[in-house]
């Protein structure tokens, strides 16, 4: 029986070993990390809500009214008043008939996909989908068809050739490592043409895209009984958890069949209570989204890499591809020495040879903070 020493050494040799740092302050651009002040460009707190005083006050109020833990699965006694209210609010906000809460986005996908497709069915997945969608598709035991990134012709051909009794197309809305946006109108049109369902992972679009931040479906004005939207509540919403929204019967089926919903303790009621306030702030958050857009435009206008490649993203995710694992991690370490925290992303998260710095911007970042990052990157290239 191995003690994994050789395996860990192999990770070290390839510059693939992951390490954690300890954050000693609330989520914000300016952090205390391992005892050091740090300017962070690595959080998914896109609207700066995670440390918002209104959310903190709402969480405190929720804890006083409902306690800390929910105590059970939602199907036992864990479904509390804030959960029910939040599901109604999310359905209304995103424009779907019904919404269902999950404890995390990973669990939402891992439960929803196998509930919708199984043996005898077929799943069609974009090659660059998030790990949770990939794992969910494998877990489902459905026939898995992986199509090249955003290749509509390949997807159309695969759908046309499939004889499966039920077909499910799954795709990120905003791809988490490249920052680009999926062609959702075309994906939905293909799904409807071939009698398939479309599940969209809107983890990085909810709160940011569409009128009042209502998400990717609203951004493209999509509506269909065959469309399901998964959104996370720990990114732009500043809290924790996730939801799946869709037609009444589809969501009811997921409630009945999603094992990660049935066998997981419900998220803490104080968080659900705070998220009701978060949805209000998202709805009223045009100024926050405008500031985020300004910071994105600033970065792209001023960071003009010569040797590295800034991928063509217009979202808060701005990937700077360096290439090699060792060089990428060296640049990340040198930025950290300068008080700038930008994570290096390596295989298997991204394809070999495309290791990168994953720069994420927030509405809470200032013009001066982005300028500081750009200056440091220019010095290091």
What are these model-derived regions, one by one?
Residues 53, 57, 61, 65, ...:
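PLP-dependent enzyme catalytic core of the Aspartate aminotransferase-like
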Residues 57, 61-104:
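Conserved N-terminal alpha-helix of the aminotransferase class I/II PLP-enzyme fold
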Residues 112-131:
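Conserved PLP-anchoring active-site segment centered on the Schiff-base-forming lysine
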Residues 212, 218-253:
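Active-site PLP attachment segment
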Residues 236-303, 308-311:
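PLP-dependent aminotransferase class I/II
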Residues 290-297, 304-338, 354, 361-363:
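Conserved PLP-binding catalytic core of the aspartate aminotransferase-like
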């Amino acid at each position: 029986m191995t003690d994994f020493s050789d395996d860990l050494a192999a990770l070290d040799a390839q510059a693939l070993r992951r390490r954690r740092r300890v954050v000693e302050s609330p989520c914000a651009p300016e952090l205390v990390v391992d005892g050091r002040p740090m300017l962070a460009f690595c959080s998914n707190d896109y609207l700066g809500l995670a440390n918002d005083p209104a959310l903190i006050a709402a969480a405190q109020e929720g804890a006083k009214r409902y306690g800390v833990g929910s105590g059970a699965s939602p199907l036992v006694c864990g479904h509390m008043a804030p959960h029910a209210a939040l599901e109604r609010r999310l359905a209304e906000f995103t424009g779907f008939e019904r919404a269902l809460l999950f404890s995390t986005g990973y669990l939402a996908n891992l439960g929803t996909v196998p509930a919708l497709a199984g043996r005898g069915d077929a799943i069609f997945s974009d090659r660059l989908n998030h790990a949770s969608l990939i794992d969910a598709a494998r877990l489902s035991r459905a026939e898995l068809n992986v199509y090249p990134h955003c290749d509509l012709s390949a997807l159309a051909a695969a759908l046309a050739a499939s004889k499966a009794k039920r077909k499910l197309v799954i795709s990120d809305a905003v791809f988490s490592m490249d920052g680009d946006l999926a062609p959702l109108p075309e994906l939905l049109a293909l799904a409807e043409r071939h009698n398939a369902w479309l599940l969209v992972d809107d983890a990085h679009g909810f709160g940011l895209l569409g009128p009042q931040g209502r998400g990717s479906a609203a951004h493209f004005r999509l509506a269909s009984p065959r469309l399901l939207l998964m959104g996370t509540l720990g990114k732009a919403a500043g809290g924790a958890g996730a939801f799946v929204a869709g037609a009444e019967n589809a969501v009811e089926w997921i409630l009945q069949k999603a094992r990660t919903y049935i066998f997981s303790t419900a998220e803490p009621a104080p968080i659900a209570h705070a998220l009701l306030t978060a949805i209000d702030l998202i709805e009223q958050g045009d100024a926050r989204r405008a500031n985020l857009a300004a910071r994105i435009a600033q970065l792209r206008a001023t960071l003009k890499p010569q040797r590295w490649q800034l991928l063509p993203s217009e979202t808060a995710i701005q990937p700077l591809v360096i290439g090699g694992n060792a060089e990428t991690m060296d640049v990340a370490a040198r930025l950290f020495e300068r008080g700038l925290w930008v994570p290096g992303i390596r295989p298997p998260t991204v394809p070999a040879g495309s290791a990168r710095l994953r720069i994420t911007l927030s509405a809470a970042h200032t013009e001066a903070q982005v300028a500081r990052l750009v200056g440091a990157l220019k010095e290091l290239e």
